[in-house]
């Protein structure tokens, strides 16, 4: 066997690129880009993985077992993949062919695994039907014996002779040594890997690595004389006892089976279907309504079997259905015409020859034919228990054979396979579930250990009395029917050991019926009959070879005596029983069970498998289904039973047009199913739903999803009521008291929502009050959008005119519950939420921390959307409008809210909104941090010398730069797969023409953009034309303005603000800006270019109120301003930053003409005209912000005018120096008059150092102070004064205290400060950093004092302490404090420098 593997050039593509545009539209990403990136990663993984023939995975059952941990959110089932030769590698989602080593990472809705396999590796010998040792999942080790060994039996008495027979032993079986096999008495037959004992004639095959030939010999043929001559009876007994599965089963049970068929050994083309067997397909046409037997034969050869409905035939391989077959049609041509991709038709030989060829390839040799199915008519082929009996004594045997044939005939009929589920799900019959493997775990009654089982493992372990438990609709009936069908088909060798299989429904029997009577009534039909005596004799003779499949078990008390005895006294009959039991009823039968099987949640891959069966013509809808549940991870478990899947199918049939795949539709369909099933008990069902809803509601708001009997009783739920079992499950295993759960957490929320709607819609006031009580438990936006998001969605799916206004009003008031906001975020834990919800919750929390304003806009938009949807669903828009209008008043919302229907119906409501914002984000990735600039700032510093214990206080900049670079690449790749989508303006307000009301103010944020494309331009043209005022905020977006020129020219009179940062303005763009007559605010910052044309013509903006120019290091800005610049009479904000010397004369004149100036920031280095500047500033009584930096400042003139600014809120002089004490004292005194001051950044200098304590005491006169900063000037005395003022009642509103770079403070001074600081209830940010040369190595007492200080600051979220050298013990103290802090989840401590050098570490 040649090694198969991928070379470095052997790249494969799993992607169907022709379908990617459709996927791009659904996902909103560039699927082609994503696919290419994904293929590259997968190729790298392939290159690492081991290649070559894997003999350990030639067993399909073993391959199937590898998928136990495989993600179920896939479009291929494990059964399909295992049948196609694949096993799960454990590397991501990679699957690999055992034969050709093909590795696949993806699934496909359009291609089956076998189709993908054949396309990518047509040369695979497994696919070509060659003998590569594949072992079918239902195959067994025991083989039919040869009539005569080659050369005669006597020839092989000697071990060496036996060993010589293994000359052509197949490569795939080399894991089992021919020498060991020959020593155990076996001779190689020459057929596959089948060996035969020279003594007893027993034949075994399917040898795998690790098999013990002696153990296999002893298990299957314990009476062999050669075996008994070599092994003691105790050894043989130990071999048998230690064998896994097949209890009480020997080889003769399989060899003498009455239901044996010749099987195609290559399962790859069979799509896991028993109808790969041509004979079985022929059997399905027994009830074929057409006449021509020739046509039937042709249909069978074309791979088709009869479904039993309306003349419809179906292909066993591709699943395609055809009907209206007429005389003269060529079924193969018709099959190929409608289903050209069918693998069965694409096999190397013609379709008519494929299956016979597969069968003949693996056919049993002639010597084995005596035990094939032809032995039904062979009088010589008799059961081993009949040998030596007389004709009359063997009567039971003939009856048993006849009974077996009748049973098989019944089970293979379409009427048995197809059992319609109740009316609502009539389209989905059990025959569509036959091909699905349910997920099963095994629970041995005497052992608490549970283990997952594959279906082959279940079949191997059928013995004694077992049950299969599951929820309502979990697939118990289908599972039992599948066993009966597989047995009858003869296509499941694992079931050959059963001569009789009885599938009995216990729901339609009476206690007085005999067992034979039940069998005749349910299974044998009008012509069949068997006596009780004969049946008893058959069971007594066959014992373990009889399997009872008992469905609809409800309790021992209702059973006839015969069945009661079979269960409770199984040691008498020794038959096998598998009983289907609802989870609630297991307890009553547990003492009689050996093993309990439990059906777990129906895998989502099975759901997709079934949907593909029904909707293969609508792949787009299937794709949308996969995308929906991929994007809503928390919903993936809702299809937990086949019954829920049936509800999905029903919904799709009833709503053939594309609908959103909402979980509400699923749950509603399920409730409809219950109402149809229990038509005669409508009132009891309604009462049960109501009481269960109350329990669900109570549990939901106490985070309880498990309940006991007391909980049920309190809610009025009858735990013994059968209807309750349709909504809840009972769990009793390993528990003193039973535990009850709803069918799923989301289903509990659905029932709770039904109950809440019922309460709010009630005519009883106490019910309404109770409903309102529960509704008010949702007391924050975070809870509404995360914890109770699904619950609210379900509430809205039950619209109620009474509940509508109440719910809408409550939701819209949540945004303004500011007093609850912080506590909610502090206490709400997302560990116990589903992954998707937890991620959203974490993201919202981070958004709130980073930008409370954006957070408010986000939650406002989402709550408004939710509330409006409910108002429309409940038809209460008019009643809700007062709440809606109140909510809209003065708010800033996202532009997309205008797509809501409300703004089409009530466009006048738009006038209440403050503004609407729209963000346009491009795919450019700007450099977040320029490390070269940081490195330059450290050039003059010498690396500090520190002890080894403190080395962790410094981290290498290169490592951070590397990580940041990698992150930037990741962000770039992510951005590349998300194509820029223009804002959607397709519904709601945008349907109005003309627009009766305009958007009061449109805020347009543009980031990382290049020129806009035509689609975006068209959208902006429409949006701009509907806006009364437009404000731009552009960043890193050179060329964007020019690209939207047509939109700006149409609406230039509406543009009132333009803020531009880190972009280059072309001359054309500067000219374009100059055509905006209504511009009131202009900001230019951080650009490498001086937009001289724009600045030369600033006087043309006659209404300009705000001018911000931040161009450090650029040519003199003030010099390029026009002479007419001072004539701008409406200036309210003036912020100029330039590091060049500047002429202030124009600026002074402008201020002189600006009586309404509120904000003044200036940074420049010009030293003249300062007096005139101060003089003119003194007249600006309305100033609220003043900031001076650079050399253009004289302290005394400014201090003299400072008391004039009684409206001042922000004073920033942090970069100015006051050298003399007199000026500094005067400054300190003046501060007392600024009673509205909120931010004070104190100047530096010796003079300020001398009066620092006075400045601190003056802060007692500043009750509004939120920010206070001292740099370089504090010492031990002045810093302790801050603590004294705080304890005296000052700083009550202080949020930020910046004490960095105060190197005059000693460690003792800090320790005293920490010990004294208290009574700062709102302090969020404390900065005590030092320069690197001033690193401070602190004692344990200081660290302890710092920890105690932090504990007394309840609102602290940021502590900056760079250059504080902390060892491991110090950090333990700090971290312990952090863990106990009220803001533990938000508190961040900055204590590590990121530097371009390594410190000098002392040994």
From Swiss-Prot:
GO terms for molecular function: ATP binding; cysteine-type endopeptidase inhibitor activity; cysteine-type endopeptidase inhibitor activity involved in apoptotic process; metal ion binding. GO terms for cellular component: basolateral plasma membrane; cytoplasm. CDD domains: BIR (cd00022). ATP binds at residue 476. BIR repeats lie at residues 63-128, 162-228, 281-346. SMART domains: BIR. Both the BIR and NACHT domains are essential for effective inhibition of pro-CASP9 cleavage. BIR3 domain binds to procaspase-9 and the NACHT domain interacts with the NACHT domain of APAF1 forming a bridge between pro-CASP9 and APAF1. Anti-apoptotic protein which acts by inhibiting the activities of CASP3, CASP7 and CASP9. Can inhibit the autocleavage of pro-CASP9 and cleavage of pro-CASP3 by CASP9. Capable of inhibiting CASP9 autoproteolysis at 'Asp-315' and decreasing the rate of auto proteolysis at 'Asp-330'. Acts as a mediator of neuronal survival in pathological conditions. Prevents motor-neuron apoptosis induced by a variety of signals. This is Baculoviral IAP repeat-containing protein 1a. The lineage of its organism: Eukaryota, Metazoa, Chordata, Craniata, Vertebrata.
């Amino acid at each position: 066997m040649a090694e198969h593997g991928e070379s470095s050039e052997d790249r494969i593509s799993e992607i169907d690129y022709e379908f990617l545009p459709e996927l791009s539209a659904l996902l909103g990403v560039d699927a082609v880009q994503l696919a290419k990136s994904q293929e590259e990663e997968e190729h790298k993984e392939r290159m690492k993985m081991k290649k070559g023939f894997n003999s350990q995975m030639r067993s399909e059952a073993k391959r199937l077992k590898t998928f136990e941990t495989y993600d179920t959110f896939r479009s291929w089932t494990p059964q399909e993949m295992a049948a196609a030769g694949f096993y799960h590698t454990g590397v991501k989602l990679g699957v690999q062919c055992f034969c050709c080593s093909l590795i696949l990472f993806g699934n496909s809705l359009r291609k089956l695994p076998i189709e993908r396999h054949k396309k990518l590796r047509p040369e695979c010998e497994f696919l070509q039907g060659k003998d590569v040792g594949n072992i079918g999942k239902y195959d067994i080790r025991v083989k039919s014996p040869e009539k005569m060994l080659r050369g005669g039996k006597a020839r092989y008495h000697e071990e060496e002779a036996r060993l010589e027979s293994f000359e052509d032993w197949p490569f795939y079986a080399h894991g089992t040594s021919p020498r060991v096999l020959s020593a155990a008495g076996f001779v190689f037959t020459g057929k596959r890997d089948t060996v035969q004992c020279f003594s007893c004639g027993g034949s075994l095959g399917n040898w795998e690595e690790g098999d013990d030939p002696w153990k296999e010999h002893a298990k299957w043929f314990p009476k062999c004389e050669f075996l008994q001559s070599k092994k003691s009876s105790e050894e043989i007994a130990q071999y048998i006892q230690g064998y896994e599965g097949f209890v009480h089963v020997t080889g003769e049970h399989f060899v003498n089976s009455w239901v044996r068929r010749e099987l195609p050994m290559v399962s790859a083309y069979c799509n896991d279907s028993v109808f790969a067997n041509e004979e079985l397909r022929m059997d399905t046409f027994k009830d074929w309504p057409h006449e021509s037997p020739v046509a039937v034969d042709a249909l069978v050869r074309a791979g088709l079997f009869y479904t039993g409905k309306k003349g419809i035939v179906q292909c066993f391989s591709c699943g395609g259905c055809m009907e209206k077959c007429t005389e003269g049609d060529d079924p193969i041509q018709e099959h190929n015409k409608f289903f050209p991709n069918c693998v069965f038709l694409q096999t190397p030989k013609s379709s008519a020859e494929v299956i016979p060829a597969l069968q003949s390839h693996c056919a049993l040799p002639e010597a084995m034919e005596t035990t094939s199915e032809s032995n039904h008519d062979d009088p010589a082929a008799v059961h081993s228990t009949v040998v030596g009996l007389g004709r009359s004594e063997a009567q039971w045997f003939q009856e048993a054979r006849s009974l077996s044939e009748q049973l098989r005939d019944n089970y293979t009929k379409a009427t048995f396979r197809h059992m319609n589920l109740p009316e609502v799900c009539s389209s989905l019959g059990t025959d569509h579930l036959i091909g699905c493997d349910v997920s099963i775990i095994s629970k041995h009654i005497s052992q608490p250990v549970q283990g997952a089982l594959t279906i082959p493992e279940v079949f191997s372990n059928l013995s004694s009395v077992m049950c299969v438990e599951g929820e309502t609709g979990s697939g118990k009936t289908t599972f039992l029917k599948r066993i009966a069908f597989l047995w009858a088909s003869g296509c499941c060798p694992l079931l050959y050991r059963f001569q009789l299989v009885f599938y009995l429904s216990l729901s339609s029997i009476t206690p007085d019926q005999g067992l034979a009577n039940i069998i005749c009534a349910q299974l044998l039909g009008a012509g069949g009959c068997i006596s009780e005596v004969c049946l008893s004799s058959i069971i007594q003779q066959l014992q373990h070879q009889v399997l009872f499949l008992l469905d609809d078990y409800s309790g021992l008390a209702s059973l006839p005596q015969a069945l009661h005895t079979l269960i409770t006294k199984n040691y008498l009959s020794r038959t096998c029983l598998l009983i289907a039991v609802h989870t609630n009823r297991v307890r009553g039968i547990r003492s009689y069970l050996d093993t309990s099987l439990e059906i777990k949640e129906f895998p989502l891959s099975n759901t997709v498998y079934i949907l593909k069966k029904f909707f293969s013509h609508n792949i787009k809808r299937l794709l949308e289904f996969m995308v929906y549940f991929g994007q809503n991870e928390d919903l993936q478990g809702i299809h937990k039973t086949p019954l829920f899947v049936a509800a999905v199918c029903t919904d799709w049939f009833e709503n053939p047009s594309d609908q959103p795949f909402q979980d509400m539709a699923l749950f509603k369909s399920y409730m409809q199913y219950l109402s149809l099933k229990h038509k005669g008990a409508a009132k009891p069902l309604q009462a049960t739903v109501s009481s269960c809803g109350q329990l669900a509601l109570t549990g939901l708001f106490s985070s309880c999803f498990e309940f006991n009997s007391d909980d049920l009783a309190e809610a009025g739920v009858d735990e013994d009521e059968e209807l309750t079992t349709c909504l809840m499950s009972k769990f009793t295993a390993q528990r003193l008291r039973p535990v009850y759960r709803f069918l799923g957490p989301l289903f509990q929320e659905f029932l709770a929502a039904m109950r809440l709607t019922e309460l709010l819609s009630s005519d009883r006031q106490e019910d309404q009050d109770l409903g309102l009580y529960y509704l008010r438990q949702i007391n924050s936006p975070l809870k509404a959008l995360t914890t109770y998001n699904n619950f609210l969605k379900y509430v809205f799916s039950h619209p109620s005119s009474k509940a509508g206004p109440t719910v809408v009003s409550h939701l819209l008031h949540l945004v303004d519950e500011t007093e609850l906001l912080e506590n909610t975020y502090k206490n709400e834990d997302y560990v116990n939420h589903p992954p998707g919800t937890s991620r959203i919750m974490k993201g919202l929390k981070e958004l709130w921390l980073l930008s409370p304003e954006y957070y408010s806009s986000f939650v406002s938009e989402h709550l408004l959307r939710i509330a409006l949807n409910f108002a429309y669903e409940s038809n209460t828009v008019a009643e809700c409008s007062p709440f809606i209008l109140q909510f809209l008043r003065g708010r800033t919302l996202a532009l997309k809210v205008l797509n809501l229907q409300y703004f089409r119906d009530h466009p006048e409501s738009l006038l209440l909104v403050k503004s609407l914002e729209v963000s346009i984000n491009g795919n450019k990735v700007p450099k977040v941090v320029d490390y070269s600039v940081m490195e330059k700032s450290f050039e003059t510093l010498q690396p500090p010398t520190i002890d080894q214990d403190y080395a962790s206080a410094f981290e290498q900049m290169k490592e951070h730069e590397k990580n940041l670079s990698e992150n930037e690449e990741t962000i770039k790749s992510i951005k590349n797969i998300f194509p820029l989508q223009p804002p959607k303006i397709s519904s709601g307000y945008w349907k109005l023409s003309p627009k009766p009301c305009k958007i009061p103010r449109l805020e347009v944020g543009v980031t990382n953009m290049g020129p806009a494309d035509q689609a975006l331009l068209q959208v902006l043209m429409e949006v701009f034309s509907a806006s009364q005022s437009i404000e731009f905020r552009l960043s890193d977006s050179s060329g964007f303005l020019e690209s939207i020129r047509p939109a700006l020219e149409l609406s230039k009179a509406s543009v009132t603000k333009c803020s531009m940062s880190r972009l280059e303005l072309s001359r054309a763009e500067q000219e374009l800006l100059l055509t905006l007559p209504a511009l009131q605010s202009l900001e230019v910052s951080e650009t490498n270019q001086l937009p001289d044309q724009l600045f030369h013509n600033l006087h043309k903006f006659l209404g300009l109120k705000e001018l911000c120019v931040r161009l450090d290091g650029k040519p003199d800005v003030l010099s390029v301003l026009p002479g007419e610049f001072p004539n701008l009479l409406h200036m309210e904000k003036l912020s100029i930053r330039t590091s060049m010397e500047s002429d202030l004369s124009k600026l002074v004149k402008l201020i002189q003409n600006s009586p309404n100036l509120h904000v003044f920031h200036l940074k420049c280095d010009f030293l003249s005209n300062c007096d005139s500047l101060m003089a003119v500033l003194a007249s600006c009584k309305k100033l609220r912000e003043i900031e001076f930096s650079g050399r253009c400042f004289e302290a005394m003139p400014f201090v003299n005018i400072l008391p004039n600014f009684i409206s001042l809120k922000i004073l920033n002089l942090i970069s100015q120096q006051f050298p003399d004490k007199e000026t500094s004292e005067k400054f300190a005194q003046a501060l007392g008059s600024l009673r509205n001051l909120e931010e004070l950044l104190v100047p530096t200098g010796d003079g300020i150092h001398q009066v620092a304590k006075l400045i601190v005491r003056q802060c007692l006169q500043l009750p509004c102070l939120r920010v206070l900063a001292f740099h370089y000037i504090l010492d031990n005395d002045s810093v302790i004064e801050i603590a004294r003022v705080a304890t005296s009642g000052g700083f009550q509103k202080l949020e930020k205290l910046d004490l960095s770079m105060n190197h005059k403070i000693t460690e003792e001074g800090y320790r005293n400060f920490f010990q004294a600081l208290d009574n700062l209830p709102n302090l969020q940010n404390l900065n005590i950093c030092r320069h690197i040369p001033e690193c401070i190595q602190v004692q344990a007492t200081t660290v302890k004092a710092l920890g105690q200080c932090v504990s007394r600051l309840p609102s602290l979220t940021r502590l900056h302490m760079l250059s504080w050298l902390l060892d491991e013990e110090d950090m333990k103290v700090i971290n312990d404090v952090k863990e106990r802090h009220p803001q533990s989840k938000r508190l961040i401590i900055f204590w590590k420098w990121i530097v371009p050098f390594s410190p000098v570490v002392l040994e």
